[in-house]
């Protein structure tokens, strides 16, 4: 059963582009927290799903209890119940460079994308994204001029009877496109694990952040789990290369897995000692990631 809601939108304007990135939550599973709790509880209870639903309806199970139970289950890695909760998004103003990455997510997500075969750009004017780095380098004017010429040639081709499916070969990766997607919560978690990471391409990070923002508005109990994989509600540590971890702006507060292994090995060998009171005089608090006890 789907819960239809008034469309709500999160957007991210980009300097110099024709369209802003917009992400709108169109609908979602009816009461995602309840649905997810029932899915998990069915696996770990003698009660039938109908009996669990009645207990929730009778207020014998609170939302706080449901949230706590789900959190405990998530820590075990039991993921299949997450597939029973789905979100439906409208995404617009994104580039084809983004879309080629987006559609690589294939499990638990379905896409419908604006076609360049059936949609013809009027007067050769196609919306496109200008990266901030291009604008800061003072090269946006040259990019605009080039795309103006592309648009003119595109229009001439269509006017000459060349099908849009062939004229589109001219169009650049910067060309904007639109999506309507349906994604289950397990897949959305995986997307955010990877695409909220600072190593992900900036446009994908923006889209993932806007999707998270939309989910937080309707189910904050679940939205808080939409983090990069190093987040406190996910792995809690970085498993990328140590070089990438060292360059990450949040690397100071998120340990790398190899660092954890080295700390454990030192502890196992008895090479560590608890933090002493006098140690605070020589170690700045901001540099402390893991403390002895």
Regions found by a protein language model. Name each.
Residues 2-293:
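Family-specific signature for flavin-dependent thymidylate synthase
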């Amino acid at each position: 059963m789907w819960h239809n809601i008034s469309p709500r939108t999160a957007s991210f304007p980009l300097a110099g582009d024709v369209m802003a990135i917009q992400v709108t939550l169109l609908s979602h599973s009816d009461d995602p927290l309840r649905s997810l709790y029932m899915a998990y509880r069915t696996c770990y209870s003698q009660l039938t799903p109908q009996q669990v639903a009645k207990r929730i309806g009778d207020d014998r199970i609170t939302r706080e209890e449901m949230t706590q139970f789900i959190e405990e289950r998530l820590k075990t890695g039991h993921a299949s119940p997450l597939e029973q909760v789905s979100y439906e998004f409208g995404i617009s103003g994104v580039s084809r460079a983004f879309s080629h990455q987006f559609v690589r997510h294939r499990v638990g997500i379905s896409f419908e994308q604006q076609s360049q075969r059936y949609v013809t750009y009027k007067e050769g004017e196609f919306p496109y994204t200008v990266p901030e780095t291009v604008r800061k380098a003072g090269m946006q004017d040259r990019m605009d001029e080039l795309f103006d010429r592309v648009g003119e040639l595109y229009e001439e081709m269509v006017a000459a009877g060349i099908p849009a499916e062939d004229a589109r070969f001219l169009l650049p990766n910067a060309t904007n496109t639109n999506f309507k997607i349906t994604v289950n919560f397990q897949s959305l978690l995986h997307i955010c694990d990877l695409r909220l990471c600072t190593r992900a391409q900036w446009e994908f990070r923006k889209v993932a952040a806007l999707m998270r923002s939309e989910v937080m508005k309707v189910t904050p109990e679940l939205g808080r789990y939409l983090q990069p994989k190093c987040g406190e509600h996910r792995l809690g540590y970085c498993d990328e290369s140590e070089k990438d971890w060292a360059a990450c702006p949040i690397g100071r507060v998120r340990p790398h897995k190899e660092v954890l292994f080295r700390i454990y090995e030192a502890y196992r060998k008895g090479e560590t000692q608890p933090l002493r009171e006098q140690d605070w005089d020589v170690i700045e608090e901001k540099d402390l990631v893991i403390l002895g006890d």
